[in-house]
Amino acid sequence: AKKQIESGQWDLIVIDSAAYATKSLLSLIDIVDLLVLPTGFSVDDLRPTVTPVNGLRNKGHSTDKMAVVFAGVSESESEYRAALEYLQPCGVPVIPGAIPFLTSFSQAQDKGLALTESPFPGPRQKADDVVQGVIDRLTTLTQ
C-alpha cells in the first residue's frame, strides 16, 4: 500500500487493515491522510476501536488523522449518544450520523451495489450523509 500511496497516482486508496495498534497500522498512520475506524454502538465493538486509537496516541500520533464511523448499527438515538460518550475520552473525531443495519443495504450489496446506490431514498440518504462526512473530514485535513 505504501508504494501506491507514495506514487501519487491515486486520489483515494482504501485499505482494509487489521484492527489494534499492529505494526501495519502504525506504518499506515504515517502515510495516510485519514484513518477511518468503523465500529458499532456496543462496548464490545467500541473497546477494540478505542484500543488502536489509544495505542497510536500513546506512540505520539494525533487523533486528528483518525475518525470513527458507526456502521451496521441500530437506529437508536440513545445508543448513538452512549457510543459518542464512550468515545469522548480518547479524543477521536466521530463522523456525524451512522450507517444502520438495514435489509435494503444487504439487498443492494447482494446486487453488487454500494450503500449509496440503494433504491430506497431514506437509507441511501443516511449512507450519503456518512460518506459526505468522511469526505468533509478528509478535505479539512488536506487543505
Model region roles, listed by residue range:
Residues S74-S76, L84-T116:
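Beta-strand-loop-alpha "switch" segments that mediate conformational coupling across diverse proteins
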Residues T22-S42:
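Inter-motif core of Ras-like GTPase G domains
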Residues I15, L37, V68-F70:
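Structural beta-sheet core signal
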Residues F41-V43, A71-S76, P121:
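Short histidine/acidic/glycine/proline-rich micro-motifs that form metal-
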Residues I5-L25:
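Switch II (G3) loop of P-loop NTPases
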Residues L115-Q143:
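NTP-binding/hydrolysis catalytic cores, primarily Walker-type P-loop NTPases
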Residues R47-D64:
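Conserved C-terminal guanine-recognition region of P-loop GTPase G domains, centered on the G4
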